[in-house]
Regions:
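Membrane-interfacial helix termini and adjacent extracytoplasmic/periplasmic loops
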Residues: 1-20, 85-101
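The feature captures the transmembrane alpha-helix scaffold of multi-pass secondary transporters
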Residues: 9-16, 26, 30, 57, ...
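Residue-level recognition of membrane-helix boundary sites in multi-pass small-molecule transporters
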Residues: 10, 28, 44, 55, ...
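Hydrophobic residues within alpha-helical transmembrane segments
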Residues: 17, 70, 74-77, 123-130
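Non-cytoplasmic
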Residues: 23-31, 68-94
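Intracellular coupling helices
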Residues: 29-69, 147-149
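C-terminal transmembrane helix and the adjacent membrane-cytosol boundary/short C-terminal tail
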Residues: 32-40, 113-149
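A short glycine-centered flexible hinge/capping loop motif at secondary-structure junctions
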Residues: 49-51, 95, 118
Length: 149
């Protein structure tokens, strides 16, 4: 056994580091593809207008990348709520020491497959859907307000 995995206070930081590491490659590839799609003429025009590197990034490149950043933030948010594999692989039958790694998806799995409490699992899954929907709509709302200004 790994000593870090038996410490209840280290469960959440370990899960965060593992989840970030797991999804970082995908997000970097998506951002690099979006950066390659930025037309060089915009950057050259900003350079000709006297904009420095920081201003070109803030006022030219980031607004062009805004849809990609919104996509990545929405998928990251959904992925953050759906953490199950990491907990199940690292801790097996229990969600960590003192149930310190209990996530909503692990709770749904436990209620549905181990305790056969189908109604509780369905209610928890529906609540998870509502929470994800709320935060996704909130992100779209903030994104559309930033576009207007």
């Amino acid at each position: 056994k790994v000593a870090l995995l038996t410490d209840a206070q280290m469960t959440i930081p370990i899960l965060i580091v593992l989840s970030v590491w797991k999804g970082l490659g995908y997000k970097i590839i998506i951002l690099l593809a979006a950066l390659q799609g930025v037309d060089e003429r915009y950057v050259k025009a900003g350079r000709m207008d006297g904009a420095g590197s920081f201003r070109r990034i803030c006022y030219i490149i980031l607004p062009i990348l805004r849809p990609t950043i919104l996509f990545l933030s929405v998928t990251s948010l959904i992925g953050a709520f759906k953490i199950f594999d990491e907990v199940y692989i690292m801790y097996g039958q229990k969600p960590g020491p003192l149930q310190s790694g209990l996530t909503i998806v692990y709770y749904i799995f436990d209620k549905f497959y181990r305790h056969w409490e189908f109604t509780t699992a369905s209610a928890a899954a529906f609540l998870l859907f509502l929470v994800i929907l709320f935060f996704t709509l909130l992100q779209f709302l903030f994104s559309s307000e930033r576009r207007k200004s």
